[in-house]
Amino acid sequence: MYISLTDLFKIGIGPSSSHTVGPMRAARRFLMELPDGMLSQIARVRVELFGSLAHTGQGHGTDVAIQLGFCGELPDEVDTASIAGRIATIAREQSISLLGQKSVRFQPLLDIRYNLKDLLPLHSNAMTFRAYGAFSDEAATTTPIAERTLYSIGGGFIVDEDEAFVGSPRGGEATMPYPFASMAELLVHGKRERLPLMDLLRANEHALRGTAATTSFLDRVIDTFFTCIDRGIATRGELPGGLNVKRRAPDIHHQLTVERGQRRIAPHKVLDWVSVYAIAVNEENAAGGRVVTAPTNGAAGVVPAVLRYARDFCDVEPEGLHDFLLVASAVGALCKMNASISGAEVGCQGEVGSAAAMAAAGLAAALGASNEQIENAAEIALEHHLGMTCDPAAGLVQVPCIERNGIGAIKAVAAASLALRGDGSHFMPLDNCIEAMRQTGEEMSTKFKETSLGGLAVNLPEC
């Protein structure tokens, strides 16, 4: 199945695509796909979380996301300002309205179970949903009338045990003008047709949904990216979760704005702008704000930061921003198809590493790079994230995640710049680097795969 722009760039809420966006969609899907008439028979729903969802779900807001999903909410539509009040009401009344149609008894502390011992075979991020019938005997509710296991495999994608791939087939994919499963195949298309990568990818997207819909979606993603940055640099205070992490983006942005009028500014200060854009996005994400998976929430700041840099400092026009995202989405799709974008599966190399590769390729494309230079930019960025662990402090998407996005964005700019200094010839193909990421992730201990059982997560300072 072709992974398109709309698959990769999902508008949703923070703090995690795999632990928030995915579980919300999964809870809703469980109820939506029940047999006709069964919803009215339900007296209670429960969910059991496994693996990384169990270990860090509370810090990532998985419990909140599941309750919203049971209520029928979607990540791109839910009113973020209403979430806290709705969750408080559910806890107080011990009742939840399934899809807004059927109220049943629900106790979050009892009906959301965190299984810290067992792992299911398909993926670490597993959820087993159970619905129980309207029996008068409480003991009888131990036998569910419906049960289904769903997996949140990164970037907001969800899959059940019977699906070979995520999502529903769109149909007509055999007529995709330029199908590809590797960068090598994409480069062959470009060489044969004498077209830049963005034109190939634009043709694919147009074949899926038409020119107007593709352009509209790209504009919506860009607007959401930049709105998130603007909101992040304007919002002060502490982030939720208990680590008492202070938002830094507003102060950094103020300092940079003041310094802009000064004559003697060190050239490297432009990197501070790139960094503050990324930090702003990830502080918004940590606070549960509206973000876009790029390719995940944990790495949501890299692509918009470099995109904003392209607009503000490189004078890239709107069409160039579209080119940026088209190319970035292809690189992200390859990382997902041939390795993983899930921190619970391959560590942070799959999240910030993939995001940096996407951003580097996108920036190179927007600045007029050849197809080979674009591939080189992506490979450089990904190569220098290989082996990066996912070990969030207290299970929150804050430390080291927020700063890591800033550094990842800077590395993406450096990778694109370095690639543009060459002629496109390079030693390591992107496809091989992605395979190295997959192999590295397979060998990585589960302590470093979004479980908060190792690394920085167990070496916090004593306060």
Walk through the language-model features, giving the residues of each.
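Non-transmembrane, aqueous-exposed alpha-helical and coiled segments at domain scale
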Residues: 2, 6, 10-13, 24-49, ...
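Conserved phosphate/anionic-ligand binding catalytic regions in large, soluble enzymes, centered on
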Residues: 9-27, 286-306, 348-356
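Alpha-helical support elements that line or immediately flank enzyme active sites
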Residues: 20-35, 304-315, 360-368
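Short, mixed-charge aromatic SLiMs
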Residues: 42-57, 89-96, 252, 326-338, ...
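C-terminal regulatory domains involved in ligand/effector binding and gene-expression control
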Residues: 75-262
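Accessory "access/gating" subregions that flank catalytic or transport cores
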Residues: 211-343, 347, 456-463
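Hydrophobic alpha-helical bundle architecture
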Residues: 327, 333-406, 418-427
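Extended hydrophobic packing segments that form well-structured cores
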Residues: 427-463
